[in-house]
Regions:
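Acidic carboxylate motifs that coordinate Ca2+ or other divalent cations, activating on Asp/Glu
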Residues: 216
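Acidic, low-complexity Ser/Thr/Gly/Pro-rich repeat segments typical of extracellular/periplasmic
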Residues: 3-11, 26-192, 196-199, 204-210, ...
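Bacterial N-terminal signal peptides
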Residues: 12-25
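An amphipathic, aromatic/His-enriched active-site/gating alpha helix that lines ligand/cofactor pockets
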Residues: 219
Length: 286
């Protein structure tokens, strides 16, 4: 009998320990929030563009450009969606799934190369990681223009770079062109006042830059500041994938941004307003 009891009772402590181990999680600390995994710090990546970069014979009417990303995105700054040559009305857009659809309210010009730039416009939908930018080129003619020019726009008083200035090219060499019509090619400067104006014609241009107060891509002396190149300019560099100046840079990378080559330097100033006054009134006829 004793042997039977000694063999039976040692089971009880083991069973008790098993019960404690089963019910112990119910006493765990529940105040710690779940981590949810690592924070997403990567910007969106473009997977597809339609029409593809370099497409020719694009229709002048009803054209839209679709950028498809690897994740859901949002438009942070609509002004960052910039068409060159600019139209009277800015491009419109809508988000459709993981795609950004850009369309134009005006017909495109015939036999014209266009660039559509997204610098500073797009971020991912969850963490707000900014898309570094992308420029696509297409043409309504047979061949995409292939030249480019780089430069810096700065304040003439302190030589500080000017962000968001509009650099404009005109084939019309008259002084009045910048007052009356939009340019044949244009681009916005980045945070460092730097610009790379790509897919332009191999021809002679007048070069201007304006701080465009009302965003109409025409120089308004009462509102805008202006810079200009005092000589005619003809581009000498050809677009290709290996050109460092055509890449999109992280604006926080000071060394890389300041190391970019700049062909032109444009110093912005404000013109003094001039008013025509009637100094004297004389009656000369009967």
């Amino acid at each position: 009998m004793k042997n039977i009891l000694s063999r039976f009772f040692p089971i009880i402590p083991a069973a008790a320990l098993l019960a404690l181990s089963v019910f112990q999680p119910s006493c765990a600390n529940t105040t710690q929030a779940p981590t949810g995994g690592a924070k997403d710090t990567l910007p969106p990546v473009i997977r597809r563009v339609v029409p593809a970069p370099g497409t020719a014979s694009v229709p002048v009417h009803g054209t839209k450009v679709v950028f498809t990303f690897d994740e859901y995105v949002t438009v942070k700054d609509p002004k960052g969606i910039f068409l060159s040559p600019p139209q009277k009305k800015s491009p419109k857009y809508k988000i459709k799934g993981k795609s950004l659809v850009v369309y134009f309210e005006e017909d495109l010009l015939p036999n014209t190369t266009y660039t559509l730039d997204l610098t500073g416009a797009i971020a991912d939908n969850n963490e707000g990681n900014m898309f570094p930018g992308f420029t696509t080129a297409f043409t309504t003619g047979e061949t995409v223009d292939s030249m480019f020019v780089t430069g810096i726009v700065q304040d003439c008083n302190n030589l500080r770079p000017i962000k968001g200035a509009t650099v404009m090219l005109y084939k019309d060499q008259s002084d009045s062109a910048v007052f009356l019509r939009r340019p044949v090619a244009a681009v916005k400067t980045d945070d460092w006042g730097y610009f790379s104006l790509r897919n332009i014609q191999d021809t002679v241009f007048r070069v201007y830059a304006i701080v465009d107060g009302n965003g109409n891509n025409i120089y308004d002396p009462d509102e805008d500041r202006i810079a200009f190149l005092d000589t005619l300019f003809r581009p000498v560099n050809v677009v290709n994938d290996t050109v460092a100046e055509l890449r999109k840079y992280d604006m926080k990378d000071t060394l890389a941004c300041q190391s970019r080559k700049a062909e032109l330097r444009l110093n912005v100033f404000r013109e003094k307003p001039s008013k025509q006054l009637l100094m004297n009134k004389v009656r000369t006829g009967a």
